[in-house]
A protein has these predicted regions:
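Transmembrane helices with small-residue packing motifs
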Residues: 29-39, 113-152, 198-201, 234-237, ...
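Extracytoplasmic/periplasmic membrane-proximal domains and adjacent transmembrane bundles
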Residues: 252, 257-434, 438, 443, ...
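Short, hydrophobic beta-strand segments
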Residues: 112, 119-124, 141-151, 186-198, ...
Length: 637
């Protein structure tokens, strides 16, 4: 019972600090807006609540259970005895190596600075390696195909070619069913694959062979894509919008120049410009002099033309009790091309029928299929599937646009590209806010600005280095052997990095808090930190191994949502493993560099300040330290 009470009183400070730290680190995530906030707000609030409850349990139920369930002496026998003796040997090994690092602190500082600098360099270089994206591509078991047909294509032509594309999807071995939606000059189709447990081939493996077969179909242009892992995306990942008050043709000229540069640089697997000036348009031009000479009524002429080709109903008639619409329209064979309009007869005076060619001519021109606008400005959009990362593709388009576009043109984005621009740039602010919150919490808990620096500097950069390795080794499109155990820099890995800050900080909290307590008991700083690191080794290893073991299954999952879970799991496992190993040796050395002497404060608190000033204690009367040299650490002599 007494042991449980002593242990609870000894750990109440670290438990409170770790609980508040872990809860505070999720606050910036919960406060985010946009897509990231919508995705992770519940995640952050749930974990913050779970951490708080865990802290309450650790301070109340755990001591009670320890007092009633643990028996004295049971740790020396059986399996528990084997585990304890093994850990004692590991602690002795750690103690001997810790002594060496404390005796070679300058080398430790150089190593710490080098690893921290490497972590900064990695996160600066990772986006340039082509591995930054909004979210990792998920195997959703679906492939979409976007159909583009010529502007003058008929619905029958488009359906015929789209059916041929549908057969390509149907012939894939793992096809479950296909779907198709066709319009005169565009369409949409695709396939749904069999469940993940039935098929062995991933969805993306089918894309090259599908594209090769679709490319051989004449009459339409169709490119297969995997749907975005996040909601709100357009048909294609790249959606780069050029807006201006200039006319559409002028904007299109600049867009074609930028698009040509991108194709030359092999930025796109497939690319397109939404504004196409290829729509044939015919206009009936009337000779008003002839119309007046023949006494034609233009309103009646318009009604006659509309009735002939428009397909509008004029009235109803009844047959055998049923009502039917009357829809006048000339035969299709007589309206296949605009020149045939001249053969239409219009009503003249006294119900005379006059050929339209008598009073009108046909004017042909080419216009844009559609005139698009964005933010009340004329807009032209460059879209496509990038051959590089989405971030690299957008960066290239931005650079070329800045070189080509004159003043008065504004760049914008839609779909996944907009999400990447808005959500992908929030990480630094959220990360820094998390560090500030943790620092303030620790400063209040330790009543010091030095101790939070020791905890954060001794753990966070090293954990970031460990997590960054799994993103630094990521190569675009799986072209490297490390692809299975690496992840991209995306919103899931970013949330993992923020979470990692709170998880790895608790290691430093345990060491620093206990070292301060030892100093207040009269132990010198060097002996205090050496003893604190040895004593706190077991709880640090227990919590760290439990964290790694709990997240390791995320690195092994497959199927729906696997990429997102892999991303979080790899960041937490890698960062926690490497961060914990380094923290055990770096934090003690940084403590010697930054921490203040607490044993002087303890003397003053005990009312010894005046006596100390009068006697001027000699150095030899201070608590002496010695290392036994056998790995048992620093002891007070």
């Amino acid at each position: 019972m007494n042991a449980a009470l002593v242990g609870a009183r000894e750990l109440i400070g670290p438990i409170i600090a770790m609980t508040i730290t872990l809860a505070a680190v999720y606050t910036p995530i919960a406060l985010q807006g946009g897509l990231t906030g919508a995705l992770f707000r519940e995640f952050a609030l749930t974990l913050a609540g779970a951490v708080f409850i865990s802290g309450v349990v650790a301070l109340t139920l755990s001591p009670m259970m320890s007092a009633h369930l643990l028996r004295a002496g049971h740790t020396d026998k059986g399996f528990s005895g084997v585990v304890n003796r093994t850990f004692d040997r590991f602690r002795d090994w750690y103690g001997s190596h810790l002594d060496r690092t404390l005796n070679a602190r300058p080398a430790v500082y150089i190593f710490w600075a080098g690893v921290s600098l490497l972590a900064l360099l990695m996160f600066a270089v990772i986006p340039k390696l082509g591995t930054k994206e909004l979210a990792p591509k998920e195997d959703q078991g679906v492939i979409f195909g976007i159909i583009t047909a010529p502007a003058n294509a008929t619905i029958d032509d488009t359906i015929r070619y789209a059916d041929a594309a549908g057969k390509v999807f149907q012939n894939i071995p793992d096809t479950r069913f296909t779907f198709q939606l066709t319009f005169p000059d565009n369409g949409f189709g695709g396939m749904v694959l069999k469940p993940w447990g039935v098929r062995k081939t991933p969805t993306k493996a089918y894309l090259p062979q599908i594209q090769a077969k679709l490319g051989a179909i004449p009459g339409i242009q169709m490119f297969p894509i995997m749907p975005s892992a996040l909601p709100g995306a357009d048909n294609f990942p790249v959606s780069f919008v050029i807006t201006s008050t200039a006319d559409q043709e002028r904007i299109l000229e600049f867009a074609k120049q930028i698009f040509a540069k991108a194709m030359q640089a092999h930025i796109f697997q497939f690319g397109d410009i939404d504004t196409k000036i290829d729509q044939p348009q015919s206009a009936i031009i009337f000779d008003h002099d002839k119309v007046a000479a023949l006494g034609l009524d233009m309103q009646q002429v318009g009604a006659d033309i509309s009735a002939s080709i428009g397909g509008n109903y004029v009235n109803r008639f009844n047959i055998e009790g049923r009502s039917y619409k009357v829809i006048p329209q000339i035969k299709r064979v007589d309206r296949l091309n605009p020149e045939q309009l001249k053969n239409i007869y219009v009503s003249g005076p006294n119900n005379q029928l006059i050929p339209l060619s008598t009073v009108a001519s046909i004017n042909h021109k080419t216009v844009a299929r559609s005139l698009n606008r964005m933010q009340q400005l004329n807009a032209v959009t460059i879209s496509g599937v990038p051959a590089v990362s989405l971030d690299a593709a957008l960066k290239f388009l931005q650079d070329e646009a800045n070189k080509i576009l004159p003043k008065g043109y504004v760049l914008d984005y839609t779909g996944e590209s907009r999400q990447l621009q808005t959500e992908g740039s929030k990480f630094l602010g959220v990360f820094l806010l998390s560090l500030v919150l943790i620092f303030l919490v620790l400063a209040a808990q330790f009543n010091s600005f030095r101790d939070p620096f020791i905890i954060l500097l001794g753990s966070v950069p090293l954990a970031m280095f460990g997590a960054g390795l799994f993103m630094f080794l990521k190569m675009p499109f799986g072209q490297f052997f490390t692809d299975r155990w690496t992840t991209s820099f995306n919103i899931y890995s970013q949330v993992g990095l923020v979470t990692l800050v709170g998880l790895v900080s608790k290691n430093g909290i345990l060491i620093v808090q206990f070292a301060n307590e030892l100093q207040r008991q009269g132990v010198t700083k060097l002996a205090a930190i050496a003893q604190a690191a040895r004593i706190r080794l077991r709880p640090i290893m227990m919590t760290s191994v439990a964290t790694v073991a709990g997240h390791f299954p995320l690195t092994l999952v497959t199927g729906a949502g696997a990429a997102a879970r892999n991303s979080i799991g790899l960041v937490l496992v890698g960062g926690m493993t490497i961060g914990t190993i380094f923290t055990l040796f770096i934090v003690p050395s940084l403590y010697m560099l930054i921490a203040k002497e607490h044993h002087e404060k303890s003397l003053m608190d005990a009312g010894w300040e005046g006596e100390r000033e009068e006697t001027d204690l000699a150095p030899e009367m201070e608590p002496a330290l010695a290392s036994d040299g056998d790995g048992n650490g620093w002891k007070q002599a």
